[in-house]
Amino acid sequence: QYMLDTTLNDLNKYPLKLSDLCVMTCNLNDAPEKVVWASSPELRHDDLPNVGLQGDSYYRPMQIQGEWLPYISKVMAIDPSGKGSNETSYVVTGLLNGNIYVLDAGGFSAGYTEHVLNKLTQIAKKHKVNKILIEDNFGQGMFEVLLKPYLIKDYKCTTELIRQTTNKHRRILDTLEPLISQHRIIVDAEVIKRDYDLTN
């Protein structure tokens, strides 16, 4: 009788898998022309904290090919905290050759305070983002109005309000699943380490 790996059955139930991400050390300003994904055992990131399903893991690229080129675009997305206890969260991404590089991500529990607004501005400045996308939860653009004076003072940058009407989990699946399953999302290893340290 064959011994079945029951963890594979669990993994097949869920469309988002850590193993479909590429995890490497990303640069602030440039990225390789091509990143080749694979999930061979020798490429597994055993040094990274893993809170995914049993049997799921992070993997290094199999190959990095071509020259390192500047990102064609860098975007920061902000999801302001709502009325409950959730955080103001952000992510910074770079785009090159159809790949999205996750360069930074985090959150602040202090809501819309001066500290949070200043920190977000400094993060945008550090990464030299071209645009800041702000999810307009229900504040009629309030967060954008609060953030703009900090941007005018320290880092002039375009902002854009994004209004969402669909369920957040559905949006995550519809948007991320095609990109992740095609191994188009490449995450900086430090982002994973820091996220784990801050939430555990």
List each language-model region with its residue ranges.
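RNase H-like, metal-dependent nuclease domains and their acidic two-metal-ion catalytic environment used
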Residues: 1-162, 188-200
